[in-house]
From Swiss-Prot:
Its main location: nucleus. Residues 1-28 are annotated as: Disordered. Disulfide bonds: none annotated. Coiled coil: none annotated. This is Replication protein A 28 kDa subunit. Phosphorylated in a cell-cycle-dependent manner (from the S phase until mitosis). Phosphorylated upon DNA damage, which promotes its translocation to nuclear foci. The gene is RPA2. Keywords: DNA replication, DNA-binding, Nucleus. GO terms for molecular function: single-stranded DNA binding. GO terms for cellular component: chromosome, telomeric region; DNA replication factor A complex; site of double-strand break. It holds the Pfam family RPA_C.
């Protein structure tokens, strides 16, 4: 009887904890950020960081490994006792330290210098500098850096402008360019050409919302792009460019996929 009741209580507690964790994830989702955004984040005490008026407790950043937090880490000395690898990474908007938890009982080599990585985890402030602690993985596709920067731009736009389209910016992509400057990637946009930027945006939309083989329709792509001040004509032109370059294909039911 007691065992049954204890099991019931344990299940209820586990269910409650799981619900609380899911609620916390909804309230504080993992935010794609540039390093510039992290370095310029507002500190409100207790190690809490605020970006675009929202508290950030979990984040994803990308960058190239340019050094190690521990000078002996490259040879393995000191990393095991600390139970983490610390990497200094840059995305050309700034530089921070990201940490990867490791199993002290397993032999593990640090990621080599000059490798492009994606770091995701908890955001903390250490010695007055932001750090991300969690997982650090190598990026196989160099385009992931561009897609991450676009994610950071779009997230900044959603949080600062919502779905409103600034008057006078319709079709110009100016709101996207302004947001690119805000997150520090304005010089990374190919030639500053909005049409080139739109092709990257459309590929990003399909990657995130295409649902496997389903892809996205022209109407869905147009609606997504219009939220960021691009016109239907802009979308059609960009999709023709992507099709000509072999970056997207049209399915039998007139949808687009990559």
């Amino acid at each position: 009887m007691l065992a049954s009741q204890a099991g019931s209580n344990f299940s209820a507690a586990a269910s409650s904890n799981g619900g609380q964790q899911q609620q916390q994830r909804r309230q504080h989702p993992i935010r794609p950020l540039t390093i510039k955004q992290m370095l310029e984040a507002q500190s409100v005490g207790g190690g809490v960081m605020v970006v675009d008026g929202r508290e950030v407790t979990q984040a994803t950043v990308v960058g190239r490994v340019v050094g190690y937090e521990n000078a002996n880490m490259a040879s393995g000395g000191g990393a095991i006792t600390a139970k983490h690898f610390g990497y200094r990474i840059t995305d050309n908007t700034g530089m921070i330290v990201v940490r990867q938890w490791i199993d002290a009982d397993r032999a593990q080599e640090p990621i080599p210098l000059n490798t492009h990585v994606r770091a995701s985890g908890t955001v903390n402030v250490w010695q007055q500098s932001p750090i991300v602690t969690g997982t650090v993985v190598s990026m196989a596709d160099s385009n992931e850096m561009n897609y991450h920067m676009l994610d950071a731009i779009l997230t900044h736009l959603r949080l600062t402008q919502g779905n409103k389209r600034a008057a006078g910016n319709i079709g110009s992509g100016a709101s996207v360019q302004n947001s690119a400057a805000a997150v520090g990637v304005q010089n990374m946009l190919p030639g500053g050409d909005n049409k080139v930027l739109l092709t990257d945006l459309l590929v990003s939309f399909i990657k995130q919302n295409g649902h496997g083989d389903a892809g996205m329709s022209m109407d869905e792509l147009t609606m997504a792009a219009q939220r960021y001040s691009f016109t239907p004509g802009d979308v059609r032109t960009a999709m023709r460019t992507l099709a000509a370059e072999g970056k997207v294909y049209q399915t039998h039911d007139n949808r687009f996929n990559i």
